[in-house]
Curated annotation (Swiss-Prot):
Gene: thcE
Protein name as annotated: Methanol:N,N-dimethyl-4-nitrosoaniline oxidoreductase
Organism: Rhodococcus erythropolis
Role summary: Catalyzes the oxidation of methanol to yield formaldehyde. While the in vivo electron acceptor is not known, N,N-dimethyl-4-nitrosoaniline (NDMA) can serve this function in vitro and is reduced to 4-(hydroxylamino)-N,N-dimethylaniline.
Subunit (UniProt): Homodecamer.
Enzyme class: oxidoreductase
Length: 423
């Protein structure tokens, strides 16, 4: 298990760089020019199930118009798997590509980051690169990341997340932190978010909320991250409902775009916590959507963490729109939890994991066999609750959590997230 005190043992914190980014309405129009200017000749385009939305076809046209050849890998799955990464890296080598473009959300971007690492290390298995700065060869292929969701912020961070499926009796979703995977160019255009379905907009929005709130209360307490962190929470509170229910509301979509990006910058150096640890564990076992997992875990984790960070959660309440002027610090912190629950209810988040059907996710669309035996619902039996709690203990996000975490302390939190209700 990761020692929770290791952060205290290393009080010198590290500020990680951000990539160059093009942000705003119409930014996607110049992807071809940017690819050409970066020297792309034959690029591997990695994406999920976006074919047919019109986005891939439009962007491929803009890229090819500038004389850049495109090789398509469109088999990236939600919660990208180790075999997605290895297949893409092999295709890159077979087709003699010189660059990568990822289009989509965090799954596309993270799979592309993983493929870059594998390519730079002569085809070594991606699962060898879990943890901090495992790359020995930093000369990765150049990478343009184009976002079509406001969620992960992967296009601005040094982190990537991969699911190790080598032992399906003990599936493992791991995090890699490596500056070698920072993208060459990020493109965020709110026009590309218009086709994101309502429920995915909500799920991804809660991913942003987790990315903003966790570094704000993190044990690292990294000052350069705090401003971006809390402002991203404010942007989510102001824009997520409108983005969900008015998908072509440009102001709301742009607000969520900005929230995603600065939340990504916040956790890039400020760290995360057990909202993400729970999410990774549930995804590993059931392949459920990462943002949805965060949404269900978030209020439970906030309640668990409150005693260690009352003042910070009180500030989050203000960012979420709560009038805290006549509240004590503890009352305001409690109100933050209530505001998060209300936001989840408003945008259609299921009340617990037991209400989640996993048969609507990419694993079924891609005909993946790995998760067939898992069923279509998340079951909260004692064995599963303990297995998830043990996975949390070993997650790379857990050391940043403000309150100490043990397997036993997580069991009631996980049990509540699967079997109990807020609404």
């Amino acid at each position: 298990a990761i020692e929770l005190n290791q952060i205290w043992d290393f009080p010198i914190k590290e500020f990680h760089p951000f990539p160059r980014a093009l942000m705003g309405v119409g930014a996607h129009d110049i992807i071809g020019v940017e690819a050409k200017n970066l020297g792309f000749k034959r690029t591997l385009l990695m994406t999920t199930g976006l074919r047919g939305s019109g986005i891939i076809e439009e962007l491929v046209g803009k890229i090819e118009y500038q004389g850049v050849e495109v090789v398509l890998y469109d088999k990236v799955e939600s919660n990208p798997k180790d075999y997605n990464v290895m297949e893409a890296a092999a295709l890159y080598q077979k087709e003699k590509c010189d660059s990568i473009i990822s289009i989509g959300g965090g799954s596309s971007h993270d799979a592309a980051k993983g493929a870059r690492v594998v390519i730079a290390h002569d085809g070594r298995n991606i699962n060898e690169f879990e943890g901090f700065a495992k790359s020995t060869n930093k000369e990765n292929p150049p990478h343009i990341a184009v976002s079509t969701t406001a969620g992960t912020g992967s296009e601005t961070s040094w982190a990537y997340v991969i699911t190790d499926t080598s032992d399906m009796n003990n599936p493992h979703k791991w995090v890699g932190f490596d500056e070698a995977t920072i993208v060459t160019l990020a493109i965020d255009d709110p026009l590309l978010y218009y086709t994101c379905p309502q429920h995915f907009t909500a799920y991804c929005g809660f991913d942003v909320l987790a990315h903003g709130s966790e570094p704000f209360v993190s044990r690292l307490d990294f000052a350069p991250s705090l401003g971006n962190a809390i402002y991203s929470v404010e942007l989510v509170a102001k824009n997520l409902r409108e983005a969900v229910f008015e998908p072509r509301n440009l102001k709301a979509r742009e607000g969520m775009m900005n929230a995603q990006y600065i939340a990504g910058q916040a956790f890039n150096s400020g760290g995360l916590g057990i909202v993400h640890s729970i999410s990774h564990a549930v995804s590993a076992f059931f392949d459920s959507h990462h943002g949805l997992n965060n949404a269900i875990a978030l209020p439970r984790v906030w309640e668990y963490n409150l005693p260690s960070r009352y003042e910070r959660y009180a500030q989050l309440a203000g960012a979420l729109g709560v009038d805290t002027r006549n509240l004590t610090t503890v009352q305001a912190a409690d109100a933050a939890v209530e505001a998060a629950i209300r936001l989840a209810k408003d945008v259609g988040i299921p009340d617990n994991f037991g209400q989640v059907r996993t048969d609507s996710y990419a694993k079924n669309q891609m005909n993946t066999k790995k998760y067939e035996g898992r069923g279509d619902v998340i079951k909260g039996d004692e064995k599963t609750v303990r297995a998830i709690s043990e996975h949390i203990q070993d997650d790379w996000c857990t050391p940043g959590n403000p309150r100490e975490v043990t397997v036993e302390s997580m069991i009631p939190v996980v049990d509540h997230a699967i079997n109990k209700s807020y609404f």
